[in-house]
Amino acid sequence: MSTVAGPSTPAGTDERLMRTSPLRRLLGRPELGSVVGAAAVFIFFSIIADSFLRASSLGTVLYAASTIGIMAAPVALLMIGGEFDLSAGVLVTSSALVSSMFSYQMTANVWVGVFVSLLVTLAVGAFNGFMLTRTKLPSFIITLGTFLMLTGLNLGFTKLISGTVSTKAIGDMEGFDSARKVFASQWTIGGVEFKVTILWWAVLVAIATWILLRTRFGNWIFAVGGEADAARAVGVPVIRTKIGLYLGVAFAAWVSGQHLLFSFDVVQSGEGVGNELIYIIAAVIGGCLITGGYGSAIGSAVGAFIFGMTSKGIVYAEWNPDWFKFFLGAMLLLATLLNAWVRKRAEATK
């Protein structure tokens, strides 16, 4: 009996061992479209606004980007996991309100209020994750309900405790100055002021990127976002993963809330409404798919940077700020189309 051997494969050319070409690797990066968009926005405002290129403008743009980017990074991870959080914007305000009102009413060290706020904020995140995994309802419905409840609680408790829609000043209380150094300080480098939120942003993006690319939990995130049932079938802890993602969003909301409080000393109970959409937009511009299973934390940072350049570029160009929402919507559409095109090109090169 004879056998017919197939064509031999030269040593070192096994398809499984072949290195991916640089072009294929580049096209496969989720943030590619956002990087192109960021370059276009930078060039655009550099041409029409002379002050945009000043060194002092860099700190302003980065600060605007960081206030969005701190939240956009965990929101991006949540979207990669196939879920949304429409309560993220008001949760930032809730975090600030709890810290302020607890410290003021209990006449306690401000750090006690900050710690209580962390527990409350994480509890809200756990609630979102628990309700999502137990009820099987869409995250849109679950977090929309949380959004409405928090909006009412923020206003109702603030009026009940302080008698107005804003909190009382706590700037003279023990622990305020040290907390401000952690959450709302700034430093000067080369005559340019940089806010500490930029550092928080960089650290959170670095951690999120490490989780996605270097840990088992990162693999779980992509798996549950791609196909939760299939992921569950191969042993991925879907429930634990999704609750963990909501806890990540809650932690970032706590950081942002403390910055809000210690920057202005008082907090308006109606703040934060609508910001959840900006976080989602930054993640989508950065390459995250609405359907889940695809995206990156670095892309969310680029998306937030585009937000910062646009929001401040319009001011430097002396345009009416009302145009900002138009540009934001246009960038969302263009980024989505560009990301779809990049993905098709990446698939075509496989």
Predicted regions mapped to residue ranges:
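Hydrophobic core segments of alpha-helical transmembrane domains in multi-pass membrane transport
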Residues: 34-46, 75, 147-155, 200-210, ...
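Single transmembrane alpha-helix segments in multi-pass membrane proteins
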Residues: 41-106, 130-137, 283-298, 330
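Transmembrane helix-bundle core of multi-pass membrane transporters
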Residues: 139-215, 243-244, 264-272, 347-350
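Hydrophobic alpha-helical transmembrane segments
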Residues: 31-36, 61, 69, 90-94, ...
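Transmembrane alpha-helical segments in multi-pass inner-membrane proteins
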Residues: 253, 263-329
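Alpha-helical transmembrane segments within multi-pass membrane transporters and channels
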Residues: 107-147, 303-306
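Helix-loop-helix "hairpin" substructures at the membrane interface of multi-pass membrane proteins
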Residues: 108-117, 123-128, 190-267
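Cytosolic-side transmembrane-helix boundaries in multi-pass membrane proteins
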Residues: 1-43, 47, 233-240, 310-350
